[in-house]
Amino acid sequence: MQFQHPHAPLYAPAPAPPAHPTPFYIEDILGRTGSSSGPVVPTPTLPSPNSSFTSLIPSYRTPIYELTPIHPVLSQYASMYPFQRSVGDFAHALIRHDPLGKPLLWSPFIQRPLHKRKGGQVRFSNDQTIELEKKFETQKYLSPPERKRLAKMLQLSERQVKTWFQNRRAKWRRLKQENPPSTGKREAEDSDTRRLSDAAARARELESGASTDSEELLDIEDEHQFTL
């Protein structure tokens, strides 16, 4: 009869480590203390982003780098905006914008009587248009001395005044055709008087050497039709 040795272990011995240990055991992560039977080939692992930094300065970890809790008063506002963006997202916000348009070529404080459009057309100012309209109400045609005097007063050229009156007469005839006047005797007399005065002014303008463009020729034909 055999007796168990008093110093024999009560449990079965632990299994021997494998011949080819893997780097996933706890011993491999914490560092092996015992010797292995064969050479172990180290397996390259990618360190974490902060592992090298924290391993170099373990003694400089002070509470200043730790996150501080938000004040209770401010925490309620932080919960209202959970998706806050960092400042880096807006670092190049201005660069992404398209460049501004063309710079200002004129100052609004500079008084310019004339503004040219495309095609050589002239844009008259409000004061010039008002004075020209007043003159047109009393006189549809201008003699050369009157045109010269009006151009000098409005700081325009005679050609500009003449062109404005040509366009204004064309508009006046068009409106008159769209809205013909009544056949009353008084209105007919007034129309005849205005027509005769316009014809006289036109005759003076032709005698003084005014231009004979197509628009002015239409005015002459209209006057002949009225006098027939």
Swiss-Prot record:
| Transferase keyword on record | no
- Protein's UniProt keywords contain Transcription: yes
Q: Name one GO biological process term.
A: exocrine pancreas development
Q: In which tissues is it expressed?
A: Expressed in embryonic endothelial and blood lineages. From late-blastula stage, expression is restricted to the dorsal marginal region of the extraembryonic yolk syncytial layer (YSL). By the onset of gastrulation, expressed in the entire dorsal half of the YSL. Post-gastrulation, expression appears in both anterior and posterior lateral plate mesoderm by the 3-somite stage. Posteriorly, expression is in the intermediate cell mass (ICM), which contains both endothelial and blood precursors.
Q: Which InterPro entries match?
A: HD (IPR001356), HD_metazoa (IPR020479), Homeobox_CS (IPR017970), Homeobox_DNA-bind_prot (IPR051000), Homeodomain-like_sf (IPR009057)
Residues the UniProt record assigns to the DNA-binding region sit at 117-176
Per the record, a Pfam family? Homeodomain
Quote the CDD domains the UniProt record gives. homeodomain
For this entry, the protein name equals Hematopoietically-expressed homeobox protein hhex
Organism for this UniProt entry: Danio rerio (Zebrafish)
Organism ancestry: Eukaryota, Metazoa, Chordata, Craniata, Vertebrata
